C-alpha cells in the first residue's frame, strides 16, 4: 500500500494512517515485559544468532557512535557496547517508553551503562543532527513503522558519509517447503502460545500479520535505494525467514 495515502495496514487490517502509531504503541506496551520471550517464541530462540550476524555486518570499531533504532529492550545494544568501548557511544532510540524502560532496567542489571543513552524518538523524524552516526542498526522494528520510506530517509540524513545502515527484519522464505511449515507455525501455533504464555493472543497475531505485510527482500532493497542509500545488498538467514539488509551513504 502507498505510504502517502490516508490509510495503511495494521497487520491485515486497513486503518487510517494517523492511527497506526497508537495501535503499534498499544501492542508493544502490552508485550514489553515479555518481549524477549516473544522473540524466542517467534524464532524458536534463533533470534540470538540472527542478531549476532547483524552485528558482524556493522563492522564496528572503538570510538564509533552507533544508533540502535527501535532498540527497545537493548538486546542489540548490549552486543554493540563492548565493541565501541568507553570512547564510543550507543544511542538506543525507541518510540515506545515502555520498551525503553524495560531496556534501561535490563542493561543496568547487567552493568552495561557507561556508553549507553536512551532516547524516546520517532524513526520517521529522528531528533539528531545531520551526519551524526557512524552506523545505524534496526532490529525487528522497521515493519512496525507507519511510513517506512520516511524513516529510511531520516536514517540516511543522520548517518555520516561513509557510514551505513543495517536492517535486521523478518522477510519472505525462499524455499516453498519452509514457507508452508513457517506459515503453519506462525498462524496456527504462535497466537495460541501468545495466549497461553503472555495472555495476549491479539498482539501476537498482529506481530505475525505484520511480518507478512512487510516488503520482501527485493522490495525493501528498492525502498532503501529510493531513500538515498547506495550499494545496497542483503543476506538471507534461515532460508529467508529473516534478512539482513545493508545500505551505504556516500
UniProtKB/Swiss-Prot annotation:
Family to which the UniProt record says this protein belongs: Belongs to the class I-like SAM-binding methyltransferase superfamily. MenG/UbiE family.
Species the sequence originates in: Coxiella burnetii (strain RSA 331 / Henzerling II)
Catalytic activity: a 2-demethylmenaquinol + S-adenosyl-L-methionine = a menaquinol + S-adenosyl-L-homocysteine + H(+); a 2-methoxy-6-(all-trans-polyprenyl)benzene-1,4-diol + S-adenosyl-L-methionine = a 5-methoxy-2-methyl-3-(all-trans-polyprenyl)benzene-1,4-diol + S-adenosyl-L-homocysteine + H(+)
BP GO terms, sorted: aerobic respiration; menaquinone biosynthetic process; methylation
Domain of life according to the entry: Bacteria
Name by which UniProt lists this protein: Ubiquinone/menaquinone biosynthesis C-methyltransferase UbiE
EC number: 2.1.1.163, 2.1.1.201
Upper taxonomic lineage: Bacteria, Pseudomonadati, Pseudomonadota, Gammaproteobacteria, Legionellales
The protein's role, per its UniProt record: Methyltransferase required for the conversion of demethylmenaquinol (DMKH2) to menaquinol (MKH2) and the conversion of 2-polyprenyl-6-methoxy-1,4-benzoquinol (DDMQH2) to 2-polyprenyl-3-methyl-6-methoxy-1,4-benzoquinol (DMQH2).
Swiss-Prot/TrEMBL keywords: Menaquinone biosynthesis, Methyltransferase, S-adenosyl-L-methionine, Transferase, Ubiquinone biosynthesis
EC top class named in words: transferase
Biological pathway: Quinol/quinone metabolism; menaquinone biosynthesis; menaquinol from 1,4-dihydroxy-2-naphthoate: step 2/2; Cofactor biosynthesis; ubiquinone biosynthesis
CDD domains in UniProt: AdoMet_MTases
Coiled coil: none
Record: residues binding S-adenosyl-L-methionine: 73, 94, 122-123
GO molecular function: 2-methoxy-6-polyprenyl-1,4-benzoquinol methyltransferase activity; demethylmenaquinone methyltransferase activity
Amino acid at each position: 500500500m502507498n505510504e502517502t495515502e490516508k490509510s495503511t495496514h495494521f497487520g491485515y487490517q486497513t486503518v487510517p494512517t494517523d492511527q497506526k502509531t497508537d495501535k503499534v504503541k498499544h501492542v508493544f506496551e502490552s508485550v514489553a515485559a515479555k518481549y524477549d520471550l516473544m522473540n524466542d517464541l517467534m524464532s524458536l530462540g534463533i533470534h540470538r544468532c540472527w542478531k549476532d550476524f547483524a552485528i558482524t555486518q556493522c563492522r564496528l570499531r572503538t570510538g564509533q557512535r552507533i544508533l540502535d533504532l527501535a532498540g527497545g529492550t537493548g538486546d542489540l545494544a548490549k552486543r554493540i557496547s563492548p565493541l565501541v568501548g568507553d570512547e564510543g557511544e550507543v544511542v538506543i532510540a525507541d518510540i515506545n517508553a515502555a520498551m525503553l524502560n524495560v531496556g534501561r532496567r535490563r542493561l543496568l542489571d547487567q552493568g552495561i551503562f557507561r556508553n549507553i543513552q536512551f532516547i524516546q524518538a520517532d524513526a520517521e523524524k529522528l531528533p539528531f543532527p545531520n551526519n551524526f552516526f557512524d552506523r545505524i542498526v534496526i532490529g525487528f522494528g522497521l515493519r512496525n513503522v507507519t511510513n517506512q520510506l520516511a524513516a529510511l530517509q531520516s536514517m540516511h540524513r543522520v548517518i555520516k558519509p561513509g557510514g551505513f545502515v543495517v536492517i535486521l527484519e523478518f522477510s519472505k522464505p525462499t524455499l516453498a517447503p519452509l514457507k508452508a511449515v513457517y506459515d503453519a507455525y506462525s498462524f496456527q501455533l504462535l497466537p495460541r502460545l501468545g495466549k497461553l504464555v503472555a495472555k495476549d493472543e491479539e498482539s501476537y497475531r498482529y506481530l505475525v500479520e505484520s511480518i507478512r505485510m512487510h516488503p520482501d527482500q527485493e522490495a525493501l532493497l528498492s525502498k532503501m535505494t529510493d531513500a538515498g542509500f547506495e550499494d545496497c545488498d542483503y543476506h538471507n538467514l534461515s532460508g529467508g525467514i529473516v534478512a539482513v539488509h545493508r545500505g551505504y551513504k556516500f
